[in-house]
Amino acid sequence: MSSYFPRRLSARALLLPLLASGALALRAQTAGSALPPPTVLSPLVVQGRATDLVGTAATASQGIVGAHELAARPFLRRGELLEVIPGVVITQHSGGGKANQYFLRGFNLDHGTDFSVNVDGMPVNLRSHGHGQGYADLNFLIPEMVRQVDYNKGPFHAEVGDFSAAGAAEFRQFDMLPENFVNVALGENRFARLVVAGSQRGNGMATTGAFEFTHDDGPWRLREDFNRYNGLVRRTWSSAAADFRLTAMAYRGTWRSTDQIPLRAVEAGTLDRFGNVDSSDGGESERASVSFDGTWKGATATTQLNAYAIHYRLNLFSNFTYFLDDPVDGDQFNQRDRRTLVGGALSHTWSALRPGGGASETTVGAQVRADFIGELGLHRSARQVRLATVRNDEVDEGSLGVFVKNETRWNAWLRSEAGARWDGYRFKVTSDDARNSGKRLDDIVSPKAGLVLGPWAKTEIYANAGFGFHSNDARGTTIRVDPADGVTPVDRVTPLARSRGVELGVRTAVLPELVSTVSLWALDLDSELVFVGDAGGTEPTDRTRRYGVELANFWRATSWLTLDADLTLTHARYREDAGAGTRIANSIATVATAGANLAQGDEGWFGGVRLRYFGPQPLIEDNSVRAPSSMTVNARLGWRTKTWEAALEVLNALDRDNYDIAYFYASRLPGEAASGVDDLHFHPAEPLTLRASVTWRF
């Protein structure tokens, strides 16, 4: 624990440096001269993966994806927006309103741990969350409003802190849409979707708004009755010297869940593949946010300020073991999360020419965040009626991160990037059991470094190394007794867990219209205790090592056809064998994706087809139980004019009986032994599904 992080620093006090620095930056930029007249905003065109990034990228595995690439893909669920990142797999084990399951680089990231997601500077990952640490629910995003996705992998970027060991993604939304539009979609299983969005310019400003409603019952025997409402309003002002945007977003979702089911019951014919054991599982969630972004531009320097306030609420009912713990009322449990989080970031970047040639760019920045969690509850329930409280907490969690990075071009063939960040955390837990209340402080320093050789023939070679971390649930940092019985002593978790990574890679655009990257990487995570949100206690995890190779290719074959193909191979193991084995459950060793998109321009045919494969995976440490591989093909075909567009989507076009996800653990059905049955539990992928849409652009 560092003495540099004041013991009396409250979460609210963490906001003061940001606000003061922002005021100084604004005064410095505006003192002595008025801002120039506003300029007219124009729609921004992003090339996406066709942009080779040679000469600008810091690692081989980072990249960008543009709006036109997102628009060409058929999506089953909102989290699949992240599948545009090579190697990322998105699945679901419950209802559509719950955050998806994320997989990358041999990690089962659960609902977001070790993968950082931001939207226009606002964090999506929720720390000390009621269901799981780093919970990242993307249901509040409207896909048509995303103009670009920036992504990177590994702990190599100083501006990214918590939850970024495996990687990070930043969604950037349109300031002004290329066209106003209305989209209506209908599909099987009572799927219906309406999106209305548009932009308007006037008085030197641009205003953009969007609304979405989605209903889906899914193929489940229990109608999912998933209703999603999304809204967005953005006001943007731009001049030669500064850009400002103010954004408000809102989301609400309600659903009924078909959670994972036991394979034994399906094979015995007593449970349908799309059936359920507990028909009362489900939930509701809401999110509302306001954010501000400002950029002040000088001849050789840029200052950026971001601030946000977010309200969030989740009420979730789940039952994964059925009647194992309670043979009468069942094992359903209720997780509740109600919070407000505020924060922001300030950075200043300046560039200079080096004596003798070359250039250097330095960025210093600070990031602050405070989560005020008024309710963090875990309760036993039956048919959504609360029976008992396992634990109920209030949590204040604050953090301050400071970073610096420098990129220098030493000569025509050598670039370097070096940086470091310091993060300090304060945890305060007020529990219904005073023995589990308390305060903790912790901090961590994470250095990063990288070299880039080239370009030669539009080819660069990268070498990167860095340290990263993720925070753990605040409740685990102060726990002393197991809330399940109120007696058993429990060890407290490490507040901040260390990760270490290296990567070697090549990026080339030597062949016309073809961008290819290959990266070799390794990532170590320390052993730690982690808080288990489903149980309210802690459990140990051993040290892990993951390494692998990634290949990504994007080819603009003609003016109307693009092809892409990506392959990821990963080796993931525990570094010590404690007797159970060294395999990491749900670590996917092989991920392959490929796609073809065609578009004849503003008018004519358009469409695409995508294949996603992920290989078999261990479900327990000794590798004696494995989940099968999964292959999914989605397709889209349509016709457009300058004002109208019609399209047909086919999801799971081969109608394969895939598992979306599988686990191995003990559960109990009525009539089974009290000790339960060890079994594979799975959530099936949705079968072949048709959806049609019509879009009017104006």
Positions of predicted regions on the chain:
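C-terminal beta-signal and adjacent terminal beta-strands/loops
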Residues: 613-620, 639-698
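Extracytoplasmic beta-strand/coil segments of soluble accessory domains associated
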Residues: 62, 79, 83-126
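Membrane-embedded beta-barrel scaffold of Gram-negative outer-membrane proteins
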Residues: 293, 298, 302-320, 454-470, ...
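Face-selective signature of the C-terminal outer-membrane beta-barrel domain
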Residues: 243-251, 283-432, 454, 514-520, ...
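Short strand-turn segments of transmembrane beta-barrel domains in outer membranes
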Residues: 150-158, 167-200, 211, 216-220, ...
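Gram-negative outer-membrane beta-barrel transporters
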Residues: 347-353, 416, 517-525, 539-621, ...
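Short acidic/polar hinge/loop motifs at secondary-structure boundaries
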Residues: 123-153, 171-172, 266, 493, ...
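Transmembrane beta-barrel wall of Gram-negative outer-membrane proteins
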Residues: 186-215, 220-258, 281-302, 350, ...
